[in-house]
Design a protein with these regions (language model features):
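Extracellular secreted precursors and ectodomains with disulfide-bonded cysteine-rich loops/domains
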Residues: 11, 44-45, 52, 58, ...
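Residue-level signal for mature regions of secreted extracellular proteins and peptides
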Residues: 5-7, 39-40, 53-54, 66, ...
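Short, structured beta-strand segments at or near domain termini in extracellular proteins/domains
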Residues: 33-55, 96-112
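Disulfide-bonded cysteine-rich modules in secreted/extracellular proteins
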Residues: 3-9, 53-69, 115-117
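Conserved hydrophobic ligand-interaction patch in extracellular adhesion modules
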Residues: 1, 61-107
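Low-complexity, Pro/Ser/Thr-rich intrinsically disordered segments
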Residues: 110-138
């Protein structure tokens, strides 16, 4: 699937280089954060409803789609963590080797549609003003 909604994916922890095996954990950002389509494979880290705890489901590198990850979290009475929650490092040291691998979040990619609609309407107004008055009034 090339088109469709995309969700934020990032490595499960960015501070693991500050603790543990320094040879294994060379840096804090193993993967840059990206937005991926549903069938991209990533690990599953779930947050409690109030966002105060995180649990890893399975192992990383993960192969779950976004839909599968959501189902796994819901099956545990939890939900996928948001991008903001993941970046607080709440999920560090919760297992599955996911500190160093990509995991799903519930954060969707911001849509360009509102921006494109605003730009289109702005151009329509400018065109109308130029054609009606021969003078651009802003």
């Amino acid at each position: 699937m090339l088109l469709g909604p995309r969700w934020y994916v990032d490595d499960g922890c960015h501070t693991e280089h500050l603790w543990g095996n320094k040879k294994k954990n060379k840096g804090g950002d193993d993967f840059p954060g990206t937005f991926e389509v549903d069938d991209f494979g990533a690990g599953v880290r779930c947050c409690s409803e109030d966002g105060t705890t995180c649990k890893t489901i399975g192992k990383c590198p993960g192969t779950a789609s976004h839909s599968e990850a959501q189902e796994k979290c819901e099956g545990k009475g939890m939900r996928l963590c948001t991008k903001d929650e993941l970046l607080t490092e709440i999920c560090c040291k919760t297992g599955g080797n996911c500190d160093n691998h990509q995991v799903w979040t519930s954060t969707p990619e911001p849509s360009l549609l509102p921006f494109l609609i605003t730009m289109y309407l702005t151009l329509v107004v400018i065109h109308h003003r130029i054609n009606n008055d021969n003078v651009l009034k802003i």
